[in-house]
Structure formats: C-alpha cells, structure tokens
C-alpha cells in the first residue's frame, strides 16, 4: 500500500442509471486534470466500456486485476461481469442484480485486505435483488454483514443540513414500534461520537417529533411523552446537547438555517422528504460505523431513463 488513496466505486445495478452517472462523475475529475486519488470501479467490463464510450469517450481508464497493483492516481476498473450476462437497459432482472452483488462482494474483500480506503455506491434495485434470491437487498445491510458491523448509521448531507436516521427501510408501523427509550439513548450517544469525529466539538442535535406538533401535550399521540422526552432528558444528563422533540414540519428548516448541527429522523420518509425537497440532486448519503467511509447517491435506479443520457450525476460526484 502506497501513500496514495484508492476509492472503490460501485456503480450499482447495470440496468439502471448507475453506470451512466458513475462515468459522468469520473469524467469531471478527469477533465479537471487533478485526480485526488485512484478510483477503482467494480463493474461489468463490457457495460462499463460502453458507458465510457457513450458519456466520456476521451476519459482515460485502465483495467486492473486487483487494486493492490495500482500505484498513484487514475481511473481503473475491475471486471466483475460474466460474458453471458443478459442485461437489458431499464429492465429489472436477477442477472443485473447478481452483477451488482458480485461488485459489492469483490470490493468488500479488497477493503478487508486493506487495498481500498473508501466506497462510493450507485443505486441498486431491491426488487431485482429479491429476484436473484440475495439475502440482504440493500447496500447498507450487505456492507454491514460483510464487515460484521452490527450498527451502521445512515447520515444524509444536503448542503448544511445533516440528518441521522434512527430507522431505515422499515414500514412506518415497524418504525413506530421500534421507538424505545434505551435504544434512542444509545443511538444519541453514537451519533454524538460521530459528530465529534466529523469536527463538531459540541454538536447541537435536534430530535424530530413523531406526531403533529410534537403531539401538543398528548392530544395527537403519546410517543413524545412516553418515549422521546425521557430519551432526550437522559441524553442531556449524559452531557449530550439534544433538543426535546420538535415538530417535523419545522425542525429540518431550523437545522438548515444553522440552529442545529444535525437532526435525528425517526423513520425513512421523515428525513428523506426533507432532504430531497431541500436539494434533491445534491443530497448524499454516508454510512458510518463501517471499517471505511461509504458514501452513496440518495436516489434509485431510475429504470425509466436508464442508458438514455438523461441522468443527473451531481449526487454521485
């Protein structure tokens, strides 16, 4: 391993927009002429070369067998495809899912071997993963399993707005049932540590409420009184600066204006709607609690526009 860093790029499902946005994002770095690291793309070689020919024909890339043989900066790719992969643009299929899954498996192995220093992921299709009978259907779950990391944390970054997710891909009913004082306290302690690692000496956290108007004293539910307020009180006694529950219709606005350093979102859509409404294209997702930092786009495979040159690549960049 040299002093140079190597970042693994996982374009995601090859039937979707992942290959297009990965190539477009890498093209910008290549055109700037100052690559900050070696970017190692784990992809179906034929489809990656096709994407390069369509969207970045002048971009210089090289094929590598392993990231360990790469010295210096540049754009490289490692072939994870099979020659007989029957992958059609815009079509959800088990073949495409298996190709994306092989890329994840190979990249995580290289991380474990110390050859990759960070991961950037494009979108995969959860329905395709089910068709392929792959156990974990999301990147976060797959990476957590591969690295034996039991408690990965999802952080959304949208300009100056930061959102931590207490739950992710659960139904709303499951997310509500998962509200628990002890678990919220543990979650608050963990994200406080992560915020300090990100450079916030005394992070000021906001807790999003579950019910309208934070239940208005119990008029619209009792989760705030039973669970959220006791958890916030416990965290403050531990020296963590966190608010009482604040209505979700205002807490994200307040954080975007700098009143809070980060917001605790209780369920998937609560934070996703806020971030994507604020700036859909520039929202990125980071997964903390893994051996390396993983960043990701905040959108899906967009099969309806796949391989048509229409996809925005800002989030991937």
PLM feature segments, named:
Residues 1-139, 182-266, 270-284, 290-295, ...:
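Contiguous, glycine/small-aliphatic-enriched amphipathic segments in soluble metabolic enzymes
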Residues 131-153:
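Glycine/threonine-rich beta-strand-loop-alpha-helix active-site module
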Residues 145-161, 288-304:
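Short, flexible loop segments at boundaries between secondary-structure elements
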Residues 156-186:
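Ligand-binding beta-strand-loop-alpha-helix segment within the catalytic cores
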